[in-house]
């Protein structure tokens, strides 16, 4: 059977925006990697309903810069930027260097693969039918100007005893064309019957 390679990893040389961590290290690589993982998990857990698409960590010798891409930037910033200050203080304790936090708004959340996958998982956890959730996501995505989309759900769908995979695809999705800008995301929905995996591919354009 043919397997699907992660489209982001496949295009690392071409799409430089795919890197989540922009830094290099020698001896303390392990320590910095664990710091990055902590930063991402802390931000994602603290702002579950802020529509966070991506958390990028950039480092210099003296500064750690955290860029949060969100569809609801106001939720993260808070009143007079108080929530951002809390994030800075929490990260600074772990990193032990000066921290800068920037919040960037995501203009079209309907085209963002991460936000689509999270939206579907929330619906599945609320016991909404996977077919209905997938069709709605595809409809909204194509309305906002995407050239193609594929959504896949795997697991005990609808509480069935035997796990299966269901998927829907609309428009063009050239996975083998390297210049094609394809966004990909994977998310897990924790339901009563077990975990359901949700995969989303979005073809934005070349």
From Swiss-Prot:
GO cellular component, as recorded: cytosolic small ribosomal subunit
Pfam family of the protein (one): Ribosomal_S3_C
GO biological process terms on file: translation
UniProt cross-references to SUPFAM superfamilies, sorted A to Z: Prokaryotic type KH domain (KH-domain type II), Ribosomal protein S3 C-terminal domain
Keyword match Ribosomal protein: yes
Keywords carried by this UniProt record: Ribonucleoprotein, Ribosomal protein, RNA-binding, rRNA-binding
InterPro entries reported for this sequence: KH_dom-like_a/b, KH_dom_type_2, KH_sf_prok-type, Ribosomal_S3_C_sf, Ribosomal_uS3_bac-typ, Ribosomal_uS3_C, Ribosomal_uS3_CS
Entry-linked PROSITE patterns: KH_TYPE_2, RIBOSOMAL_S3
Function: Binds the lower part of the 30S subunit head. Binds mRNA in the 70S ribosome, positioning it for translation.
Family under the similarity heading: Belongs to the universal ribosomal protein uS3 family.
Name this polypeptide is given: Small ribosomal subunit protein uS3
Annotated organism of origin: Wolbachia pipientis subsp. Culex pipiens (strain wPip)
